[in-house]
Amino acid sequence: MMRKAVLTLLALACLLLDFENLEATAGNEDRILVVAQHMEAAFRKLEDYTCDVDQIFYQDGAENQRYLFKFYFKKEKKIRVDFYQPHSGLIIFYHDEEKEATVVPLRLLSGLKFRLSVDNSLMKTLAGQRINQTDMGYFIKFMFKNLRTVEQKETEFREDNERVEFLFWAWDYVEEKSAEKYRISISKKHWLPIRIERYNLEDRRLEVTDIRNYVLNAHLEDKLFVP
């Protein structure tokens, strides 16, 4: 009799734990959705922005390559990237819906230009990300899509007065073929990401991107995006 009562209590305890885990997961998904909605609303108000990006790629858990660049964006999807490291002086220009981007290898030799397909391997990051997948509008759509289609397994959500940080499960950013984890930090000042860490399912670090010095709605001139 006593054994049966103990087993019943254990079963109830397990059910309660499962319920709490489901509730926590659902709660985190709801909170991440609210963050994504804040980001979407903030992005709608943007006409342009610039930021400094420090992007590190890892191989076998160790730092492999590092890229430093300034990113310019103007609606509707005009993009300019000025590299500091490596390829100092290299500039990439891209306009929405175009199948090619313009590359200026050296800032001082602006007359020297190349047109390359956005699918060219030279125009992709080490993770395979294309130039037309680099703006915040694309990233926000990526978040909404994966909130609808991917279960948010682990529960990790932290918030203070300045930022929100959470663990986000998603298909890979580029081809959507392999599952990955992202640890994302969002500034509550402008509701844009300030740090994105990417991991595989074995918790091996793949990529870390720090985004700093946002300047929003600076009325960037169109000529800035002309090669």
Predicted regions and their residues:
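Positively charged n-region of N-terminal signal peptides that target proteins for export
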Residues: 1-5
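Bacterial N-terminal signal peptides
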Residues: 8-18
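N-terminal leader/targeting segments and the immediate start of mature chains
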Residues: 16-65, 77-78, 150, 154-157, ...
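A generic structural motif
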Residues: 54-58, 82-84, 104-106, 171, ...
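Solvent-exposed loop/turn segments connecting transmembrane beta-strands
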Residues: 61-63, 89-90, 176, 202-204
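An acidic-aromatic
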Residues: 70-133, 204-207
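Gly/Pro-enriched, hydrophobic low-complexity segments
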Residues: 125-129, 133, 137-227
